[in-house]
């Protein structure tokens, strides 16, 4: 499993129980244990690869915890996203690029919420904006692999480049 630097805020059992009451559901025990250990936190450089045509991979930047600073506080993030993500889901961590990883409070399913989908369609339905990532938190955590972005660039080389002819003309005219 990937290393996660725990939050400096300590897990608060009472605040966690109050949050569950607000949700009207008990969160999975494995999620509570994760919060007791890390209470959110920041993972090392990582990648989660998906078997999806639209989104191939993502990186987790921050996990949310109980009574953390507002930007990484579970309750605060839930209030921010509750109308945007599918119902019966809570945001558990932030992914690179503004997307959110969600935990379904009924079945423990982990999904990636793609914020771009709500910008593309006026008839947007939050239920259509998620991609399944894992069947449980434990499975999700096992999918997070260490990844060094700098080393990864060494593996790629440019094979072909296309420049819009109109853009090229504009660049040349700016030089003159």
Task: List each language-model region with its residue ranges.
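A surface-exposed partner-binding patch
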Residues: 1-100, 151-160, 165-176
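Residues in well-ordered beta-strands of folded domains
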Residues: 93, 111-113
């Amino acid at each position: 499993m990937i290393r996660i630097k725990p939050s400096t805020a300590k897990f608060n059992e009472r605040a966690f129980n109050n949050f569950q009451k607000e949700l009207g559901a008990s969160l999975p025990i494995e999620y509570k244990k994760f919060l007791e250990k890390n209470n959110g936190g920041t993972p090392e450089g990582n990648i989660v690869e998906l078997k999806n045509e639209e989104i191939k991979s993502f990186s987790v930047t921050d996990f949310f915890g109980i009574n953390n600073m507002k930007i990484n506080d579970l309750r605060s993030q839930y209030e921010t996203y509750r109308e945007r993500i599918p119902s019966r889901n809570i945001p558990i961590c932030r992914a690179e690029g503004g997307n959110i990883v969600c935990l379904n409070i009924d079945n423990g399913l982990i999904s990636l919420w793609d914020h771009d989908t709500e910008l593309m369609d006026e008839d947007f339905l939050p239920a259509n904006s998620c991609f399944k990532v894992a069947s449980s938190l434990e499975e999700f955590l096992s999918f997070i692999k260490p990844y060094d972005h700098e080393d990864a660039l060494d593996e790629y080389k440019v094979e072909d480049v296309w420049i819009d002819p109109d853009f090229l003309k504009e660049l040349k005219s700016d030089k003159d």
